[in-house]
């Protein structure tokens, strides 16, 4: 069966962080699928002393007039603080994350802000490897930035679109891939890759 043609990806800026002296955006991504509305990562909703040195400037989903109730499924690419800080807004709804990522976030010190991961009512669905989330929507492990990082592959036509989280932090990491995850994403021959900390999607260089 062919994937639906009407799957769209929309980036939403939810924060800025100070990294190496420059402001770095934080985006989450909404995937509108005929069968469900999927949110990839949840950004941040509050400040925390553990990341005060990054001078977060927040514009969380719940302050943007975003339709929180309209989200059916949440995917965490990984559980660093700037990707899971809004998980509590979706308490009771399924949040898909790789089991290894969840285990690391729960057991390793200084990995994340643990109270954000373990917010009351948050319901994780641990994933082991690849998973077809919906027709035309796949979760694929892409280790590198973290051991349990995953990306979302959207089959929209001849070539897929990837929502990659931090599989790469900047475009050069996909231009010249090194990690297992980056190599795996490039092997998909994607049309474009949305990243958390870039304003525009990465596209393959044309000769």
Give a label for each model feature:
Residues 85-91, 204-206:
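Metal-dependent catalytic neighborhoods of phosphoester/phosphodiester hydrolases
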């Amino acid at each position: 069966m062919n994937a639906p043609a009407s799957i769209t990806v929309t980036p939403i800026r939810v924060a800025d962080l100070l990294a190496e002296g420059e402001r770095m955006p934080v985006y989450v991504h909404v995937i509108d699928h005929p069968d469900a509305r999927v949110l990839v990562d949840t950004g941040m909703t509050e400040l925390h002393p553990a990341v005060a040195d990054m001078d977060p400037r927040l514009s969380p989903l719940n302050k943007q007039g975003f339709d929180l109730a309209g989200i059916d499924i949440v995917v965490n690419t990984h559980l660093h603080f700037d990707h899971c800080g809004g998980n509590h807004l979706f308490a009771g709804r399924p949040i898909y994350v790789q089991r290894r990522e969840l285990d690391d976030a729960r057991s390793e010190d200084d990995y994340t802000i643990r109270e954000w991961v373990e917010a009351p009512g948050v319901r994780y669905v641990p994933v082991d490897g690849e998973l077809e989330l919906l027709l035309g929507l796949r979760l694929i492990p892409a280790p590198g930035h973290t051991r349990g990082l995953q990306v979302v592959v959207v089959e929209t036509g001849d070539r897929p679109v990837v929502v990659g989280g931090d599989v790469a932090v900047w475009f050069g990491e996909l231009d010249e891939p090194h990690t297992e995850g980056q190599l795996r994403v490039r092997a998909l021959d994607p049309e474009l890759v949305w990243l958390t900390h870039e304003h525009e999607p990465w596209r393959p260089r044309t000769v």
